[in-house]
Swiss-Prot record:
Keywords linked to the UniProt accession: Cytoplasm, Elongation factor, Protein biosynthesis
InterPro entries per the UniProt record, alphabetical: Elong-fact-P_C (IPR015365), NA-bd_OB-fold (IPR012340), Rib_uL2_dom2 (IPR014722), Transl_elong_fac_P/YeiP (IPR020599), Transl_elong_KOW-like (IPR013185), Transl_elong_P/YeiP_cen (IPR001059), Transl_elongation_fac_P (IPR011768), Translation_prot_SH3-like_sf (IPR008991)
UniProt-listed PANTHER family: ELONGATION FACTOR P, ELONGATION FACTOR P (EF-P) FAMILY PROTEIN
A single GO molecular function term of this UniProt record: translation elongation factor activity
Subcellular compartments: Cytoplasm
Name of the protein in its database record: Elongation factor P
Physiological role: Involved in peptide bond synthesis. Stimulates efficient translation and peptide-bond synthesis on native or reconstituted 70S ribosomes in vitro. Probably functions indirectly by altering the affinity of the ribosome for aminoacyl-tRNA, thus increasing their reactivity as acceptors for peptidyl transferase.
Chain's gene name: efp
Family: Belongs to the elongation factor P family.
Top-level taxonomic group: Bacteria
Pathway the protein takes part in: Protein biosynthesis; polypeptide chain elongation
Organism annotation: Mycoplasmopsis synoviae (strain 53) (Mycoplasma synoviae)
SMART domains linked: EFP, Elong-fact-P_C
Length: 186
């Protein structure tokens, strides 16, 4: 059992039949009362983020999550297909579970697949990925007063705002958490 007082980001646990990973945890003590713990946690089955409240002495069941390194092969209308490069086994994951992640996946991208007792929960991407710009409108001359941005399209068809100097065929670094421009790749 895990004491909720020991919550910190990255800890996985089971509660009410769901599997969560702690994103943030705050501890507060009120006068003579017991300490309270509020945890911002992501439900690994649904992808939803919720705030859970516990009293100081509560304990939760740990969830032992297995992570497997896999390569993205391709996707169709309903699934994505991944291959384990160590034994060449393939798995499929429902496209709805990885909708956001698809914005950053290109062929042969390496991902971590999170599994709980042979149930595939989701995939974990690196914090940042390098993607090629496939469409970028020309910079408008004279529009340089207040950090001008323009919308570009990446090789995965994801659109985001970038600085004006980004051109077609440039490779840029994108945050997989926020979907924002991080910098230009070297």
């Amino acid at each position: 059992m895990i004491e909720v007082n020991k919550f910190k980001p990255g800890i996985t646990f089971q509660d009410s039949g769901n599997i969560y990973v702690v994103l943030e945890a705050t501890h507060s003590k009120q006068g003579r009362g017991q300490a309270n713990v509020k945890a911002k946690a992501k439900n690994l089955r649904t992808g939803a983020t919720t705030i859970l409240s516990f009293t100081g002495g509560d304990k939760v069941e740990p969830a032992h999550i297995e992570k497997r390194k896999m390569n993205f092969l391709y996707s169709d209308d309903s699934n994505i297909y991944l291959m384990d490069s160590s034994d060449y086994s393939q798995i499929e994951i429902d496209l709805l579970k990885v909708e956001w992640e698809m914005n950053f996946l290109k062929e042969n991208s390496e991902v971590q697949v999170r599994m709980f007792q042979d149930e595939i929960l989701d995939i974990e991407l690196p914090a940042n990925v390098d993607l090629k710009v496939t469409y970028a409108p020309d910079a408008v001359k004279g529009n340089t007063t207040t950090n001008p941005q323009k919308k570009v399209t990446l090789e995965t068809n994801f659109e985001l705002e970038t600085p004006m100097f980004i051109k077609e065929n440039d490779v840029i670094i994108v945050s997989t958490e926020t979907g924002k421009y991080v910098g230009k790749s070297k």
